[in-house]
Amino acid sequence: KGAHIFRAREIPRKGNTGKTIFLNYVSWPLYAAGALNRLPGGYDAVFCFNTSPVLMCWPAIKYAKKHKIPFTNYVLDLWPENLYSVLPVKNSFMRWVAQTVSDSLYKRADRLIAMSVPLQKRLIARTGKPEKDVAVISQYCEDFYAVPCHDPELEARFSGRFNLVFTGTFTPAQSLNMVLRAVLDARAAGAENLHLLLVGDGMSRESLQALAEELHAGDVVTFYGSVPAEKVPSFTTLADA
């Protein structure tokens, strides 16, 4: 009954520098591959919920091949494109390596799952797999996120403004620095009540806060921090956009 969880080590990406991000990305797959002998076995298939890095599917490939069982890879972050949103890789050889490794790992899955039809087409083009081997299963959010939730205290705090609300993880992929600059431009053009409310956390939070301070945007943006999932509707209900 239930799920048995086996954890593997990883090198934390302290400071989110290029070096620590790289070490974080490569460490978990290596540690996980070395820990496969801890698994009791008897499995019918291997399923990978493949976010970042793409290398996280390598232990799954290794286990499936050893035990001759099918491997399905649910692709949520497309690599190496997602990598480039975090690390500005300019070297053409390194980009070729990232592309080649990513395509090779995707090809080694017996079946791929994409989040959307455009991603499905992209994976088919890159792997040469037939359409029947690349399914589409869209992501969704739990029903409670769609139910408005009024919080009088929050509504009083953020009333009288046009609230642009973002909830989630702050990473370079979200380009929230661009959003902040756009809000400032809009306010300068006359949208004086426009306010950016950022709920969450992530590797870009410190740089975003530094940018807000540099641009004197203290009254333009609020960094609320992380909240429990069930609290999120209280913030999205505040959103005018």
Region locations from a protein language model:
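An aromatic- and histidine-rich active-site surface loop
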Residues: 22-32, 45-76, 80-82
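Acidic anion/phosphate-binding donor-loop and adjacent secondary structure
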Residues: 124-125, 132, 140-156, 175
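Conserved donor-binding/catalytic core segment of Leloir-type glycosyltransferases
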Residues: 155-174, 179-184, 197
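Membrane-proximal helix-turn-helix segments that form the acceptor-binding/catalytic region
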Residues: 55, 62-67, 92-114
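Nucleotide-activated donor-binding/catalytic signature segment of Leloir-type glycosyltransferases, i.e.
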Residues: 206-233
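Carbohydrate-associated surface elements
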Residues: 118, 137-140, 226
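A conserved catalytic-core segment of Leloir-type glycosyltransferases
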Residues: 1-31, 36-40
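Acidic donor-binding loop of glycosyltransferase active sites
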Residues: 110, 236-241
